[in-house]
A protein has these predicted regions:
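An N-terminal-biased, well-structured beta-alpha scaffold segment characteristic
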Residues: 2-106, 110
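Glycine/serine-rich phosphate-binding loop and adjoining beta1-alpha1 elements at the start
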Residues: 8, 82-169
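Glycine-rich phosphate/diphosphate-binding loop of Rossmann-like nucleotide-binding domains
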Residues: 13-28, 34-36, 159-229
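Generic secondary-structure signature for well-ordered alpha-helical cores
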Residues: 28-32, 55-56, 70-73, 109-113, ...
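Short beta->alpha connector loops at strand-helix junctions that form conserved
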Residues: 36-37, 60-61, 94-96, 116-121, ...
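Short gly/pro/ser/thr-enriched loop/turn and capping motifs at secondary-structure boundaries
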Residues: 41-43, 99-101, 121-125, 202-204, ...
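Residue-level detector of alpha-helix initiation sites
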Residues: 76, 136, 177-179
Length: 236
């Protein structure tokens, strides 16, 4: 199969859908891989690295879409890409069709075959392609929250973990799923006083088994959340 890797052009998206090592794996299995010029540069991968892996470099996004039988992306095509997707072409990416009617209609009109990573379910009922994104989101939320606690960002001017003689920040995490679990672990690792709320008592019991001592679990109710929001320094 002819596989195309276009450069991501959505605002603030710096990732690339296939690493040079991934390209090498595909080439060794008999596939042809075309990568747009500088597609991987913002992720630290040069064109030369892809060429050494056996991939071919194409100068433009139009060339990649026009050549490939299967397009592999990170994020959904933006409006300028709609016309590049052609009938029968396979497009693998995170689409999130439910929140974007224009994108959905454009892909239907193109008659392409779309595989939305976020809908892939394994035999255990898990979402193996969505979980890594959720792990990143949970951990990043704490980093961003810590930044907005700084005075220059309009915050209280406190550290998540405090310092000797000063209490740590109180962090509230709503939901004990993948995002919430990773947010709680990240905040706890920085020394914060963390409370994680969820509506599932079985899930709260699971969290109690492996969370560090500075993480408390609490049933998610309107009353509990109202009280915690009033006293928390940060909420994820």
């Amino acid at each position: 199969m002819i596989v195309g890797i276009p450069k991501e052009i959505k605002n603030n998206e710096n990732r690339v859908s296939l690493t040079p090592s991934g390209a090498r794996e595909l080439v060794q299995r008999g596939h042809t891989v075309y990568v747009q010029h500088t597609a991987g540069i913002n992720s630290g991968f040069t064109d030369e690295a892809y060429e050494k892996a056996g991939a071919h470099i194409l100068p433009s996004i139009e060339d990649v879409y026009g050549t490939a039988e299967m397009i592999i992306k990170v994020k959904e095509p933006i409006e300028s890409e709609y016309g590049l997707v052609r009938e029968g072409q396979l497009v693998f990416t995170y689409f999130h069709f439910a929140c974007d009617q224009q994108l959905t209609e454009a892909m239907i009109k193109s008659k392409s075959v779309c595989m939305a990573y976020e809908t892939v379910v394994d035999r255990q009922g898990a979402l193996p392609l969505l979980i890594p994104m959720s792990e990143v989101a949970g951990r990043m939320s704490v980093q961003e929250g810590a930044r907005f606690l700084e005075k220059p960002q309009g915050g209280k001017g406190i550290l998540l973990g405090g310092v000797p003689g000063v209490k740590p920040a109180k962090v509230l995490v709503l939901g004990g799923g993948v995002v919430g679990t990773n947010a709680a672990l990240m905040a706890a690792g920085l020394g914060a006083d963390v409370t994680i709320c969820d509506i599932s008592l079985p899930r709260l019991r699971q969290l109690n088994e492996f969370m560090p001592k500075n993480v408390k679990t609490l049933f998610s109710s309107a009353h509990n959340i109202d009280c915690l929001l009033y006293t928390s320094d940060a909420a994820d």
